[in-house]
Amino acid sequence: MSRIGKRPISIPSGVDAKIEGSKIVFTKGKQEKVLETYGRVGLEIANGELVLKLGGEDAQSKAYWGTYRALANNIVIGLSAGFTKQLEINGVGYKAAVKGSVLELALGFSHPVNYEIPEGVEIAVEKNVITIKGSDKQQIGQIAAEIREFRPPEPYKGKGVKYSDETIIRKAGKTSKK
């Protein structure tokens, strides 16, 4: 049984949560996020806490219970504090720059790689570190993965785009015969 679903989500000041049928609407200022549960879990707000109740006793309902609780918690954290991912660029001549709403990457190709920055996401570049900030955890992770995919780190010299906390397992190069 899910132990994650049992935990109530405390709603911080500044973030407002309302239940509209099977939807939970979270708002903070002009930002609004909606989580649709499709009636799979019971919803209740009491004492500044959001409580999700088990929808049924089958295994599927128990899985949904923990999943929707985690998704709702990510929305609350995203609206109150936000999420950040950092990428590092390693390689001679590899650069990144933000030009308007486009991230321009020079990754050793014959052409620059342009990545359109979606609304609600901030991307900052400082030397060889790309910082991605936003309120949607899934979107931030997806953007970081898409940028990394342009030039994943290679195992011989470590050149490419990698997550800042990622370790690259290096391989030894060819050895000469004597």
Curated annotation (Swiss-Prot):
Give the source's domain of life in one word: Bacteria
- Mind listing the UniProt keywords for this protein, alphabetically? Ribonucleoprotein, Ribosomal protein, RNA-binding, rRNA-binding
**A GO CC annotation given for this chain:** cytosolic large ribosomal subunit
Entries under Pfam families matching the protein: Ribosomal_L6
Its BP terms in the Gene Ontology are: cytoplasmic translation
In the record, what terms sit under GO molecular function? rRNA binding; structural constituent of ribosome
Database matches in Gene3D superfamilies: Ribosomal protein L6, alpha-beta domain (3.90.930.12)
Under the heading InterPro entries, the entry gives: Ribosomal_uL6-like (IPR000702), Ribosomal_uL6-like_a/b-dom_sf (IPR036789), Ribosomal_uL6_a/b-dom (IPR020040), Ribosomal_uL6_bac-type (IPR019906), Ribosomal_uL6_CS (IPR002358)
User: Which proteins does it associate with, and in what oligomeric form?
Assistant: Part of the 50S ribosomal subunit.
Protein function? This protein binds to the 23S rRNA, and is important in its secondary structure. It is located near the subunit interface in the base of the L7/L12 stalk, and near the tRNA binding site of the peptidyltransferase center.
User: Which family does the similarity line name?
Assistant: Belongs to the universal ribosomal protein uL6 family.
PANTHER family reported for this sequence: 60S/50S RIBOSOMAL PROTEIN L6/L9, LARGE RIBOSOMAL SUBUNIT PROTEIN UL6M
Q: Know the name of this protein?
A: Large ribosomal subunit protein uL6
Q: Which organism is it from?
A: Wolinella succinogenes (strain ATCC 29543 / DSM 1740 / CCUG 13145 / JCM 31913 / LMG 7466 / NCTC 11488 / FDC 602W) (Vibrio succinogenes)
The gene coding this protein? rplF
